[in-house]
Amino acid sequence: METELCLAAGYIETFAGNGKARSTGDGKRAVKAGIPLPHHAALDREEQWFYFAESGSDRIRRVHLQEGTVHNFAGIGETCYSGDDGVCGEAGLYLPLGVAFDSRNNLYICDSGSNRIRKVDHETGIITTVVGTGQHGFNGDGPAREVNLTWPAAIAFGTDDVLYIADTQAHKVRRYDPKTDLVTTIAGTWTAEDDAREQPLVARNLVVLSGDAIGIDFSDDQGWLMPVCSDGLDMSMYLDDGKPAMDARLYDIVGIAVDSKDDVYVVDKGSNRVRKIDVQTGVISTVAGVCRYGYDGDDKPAVRAMLHAPEAAIFDRDGHLYISDTMNHRVRKVDGKTGMITTVAGNGDSGYEDKNIGGCGAARFVAKESAGQLKHGDGLLGIEAVVNSPVGLAMDSQGHLYICERGENKIRRLKLS
């Protein structure tokens, strides 16, 4: 068995990918295959196959967990939309980013560039569009195939096969109910004024805050002080905890997860936070991050810890939340009981120091063992290894965390304690 698991708790290995940015190796060992820009991932219900969106080739590929071989599943390797009502392996995908399984083992694909959510029937392999017209720009709620999506980036299922969609460039979270075939909005508002506020402000009269809270305050045209990040971006529109989620500004939501209570968590890369939408009350709150980007350590409440452009989140069966802290090159864990944040993978380095080698290219220093062998970090503790720009996360029933390492074109596997 190629992928027989022998990792000790806390250690990391390469599960798939040779680090090269060209899609290769169908039918061969996954660790020898090229998997350009793996994004989000999921395991099927039987945990026979591991599926991932290979955004660099516009395909969905899968790894057989027992044999360790990789195979194409959906997409033809061309950036296009085509093939509805046909076999998924002959359909065109346009920047697929998200994948998720419903209770019947049907695979749903977030076909971002075509502004659609597509479904592959488990029994027949036929692909269809279930949400989206193909047009972008918010046009309200209603029947699923009459509703526009705008570059959706992630999907996740709740109970009763209700699908939650990160409608990224519409700055909204959408809810698709397959029983009624209706799409509704559960979070997010955005206006033309909000677009203007994404630009750095110019200081006229300013007051420097004491300490290192958010940054500095700029006076707007009405004389109000606005909390601003150190890079000049207006953060005032994000200070909406405790308010209805429908009134919240969601800047760049690129990840989504659902907990055991059916509450929805969105990863807002643009505000460097993970937000929680309480489905009973409709109220939004922050569970990790402080708006400002950076890294200021672990072992503190997650709501006081800095994140840097996080892109994904997932829950384990004990209710702990794992976050891809992408530009901090770490995977973080938020304890479900205490709310404290720690790192489970990644030492914070983006991946080694590049050196010129006399006009012949560049060499990468990885890591050196006492025996003089170079390593990427496999076989090390997860917190000692380099994890370069982690994005999508998946979890199996044995407590293994799968990490799509976009910066290295690999998928890593970590044995959780």
Spans of features found by a protein language model:
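Conserved beta-strand position repeated across blades of beta-propeller domains
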Residues: 34, 39-42, 97-100, 153-156, ...
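Residue-level detector of Asp-centered blade-edge/turn motifs that repeat once per structural unit
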Residues: 43-47, 101-104, 157-160, 258-261, ...
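Blade-level signature of beta-propeller repeat domains, shared across WD40, Kelch, NHL, RCC1
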Residues: 388-417
